[in-house]
């Protein structure tokens, strides 16, 4: 019997949740936290107005990016150009080049 009373209480709570969910979707209950208007006015085909802080930050991070790119290119250029050294042709053997031995005439 206690299982039935627990089941009935769950059904009651579920019914309340379902009813309150329907009311919220219909707009009858709940709290709206929106301001009601557009927070940022659109500026069609106009440049955004930047603050001095935004300009400073953008120039700082742009300079930092280019410093890092040029520093890495100067000190670790093999990362960009490839890190395998070009082989010295004077060390290649005739067999590697496909040249037959001299005693074969």
From Swiss-Prot:
Keyword Repeat (UniProt): no
Entries under InterPro entries matching the protein: NDUFB2_animal
Record GO biological process: aerobic respiration; mitochondrial electron transport, NADH to ubiquinone; mitochondrial respiratory chain complex I assembly; proton motive force-driven mitochondrial ATP synthesis
Main location: mitochondrion
Topology of this chain in the membrane: Peripheral membrane protein
Transit peptide: 1-33
Coiled-coil regions, chain positions: none
Bilayer-crossing regions: none
Keywords: Electron transport, Membrane, Mitochondrion, Mitochondrion inner membrane, Respiratory chain, Transit peptide, Transport
Pfam families linked: NADH_B2 (PF14813)
Annotated segments matching region Disordered: 85-105
MF terms (GO), sorted A to Z: NADH dehydrogenase (ubiquinone) activity
Cellular compartments annotated: Mitochondrion inner membrane
Biased composition (Acidic residues): 93-105
Gene Ontology annotations for the cellular component aspect, listed alphabetically: mitochondrial inner membrane; mitochondrion; respiratory chain complex I
Protein family per UniProt: Belongs to the complex I NDUFB2 subunit family.
Main function: Accessory subunit of the mitochondrial membrane respiratory chain NADH dehydrogenase (Complex I), that is believed not to be involved in catalysis. Complex I functions in the transfer of electrons from NADH to the respiratory chain. The immediate electron acceptor for the enzyme is believed to be ubiquinone.
Assembly: Complex I is composed of 45 different subunits.
Name of the protein this chain belongs to: NADH dehydrogenase [ubiquinone] 1 beta subcomplex subunit 2, mitochondrial
Gene: NDUFB2
């Amino acid at each position: 019997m206690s299982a039935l009373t627990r089941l009935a209480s769950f059904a009651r709570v579920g019914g309340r949740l379902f009813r309150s969910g329907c009311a919220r979707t219909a707009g009858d209950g709940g709290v709206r936290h929106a301001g009601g208007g557009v927070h940022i006015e659109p500026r069609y085909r106009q440049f955004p107005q930047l603050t001095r802080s935004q300009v400073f930050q953008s120039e700082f991070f742009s300079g930092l990016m280019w410093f890092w790119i040029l520093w890495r290119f100067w000190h670790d250029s093999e990362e960009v150009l490839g890190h395998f050294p070009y082989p010295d042709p004077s060390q290649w053997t005739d067999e590697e080049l496909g040249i037959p031995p001299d005693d074969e005439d």
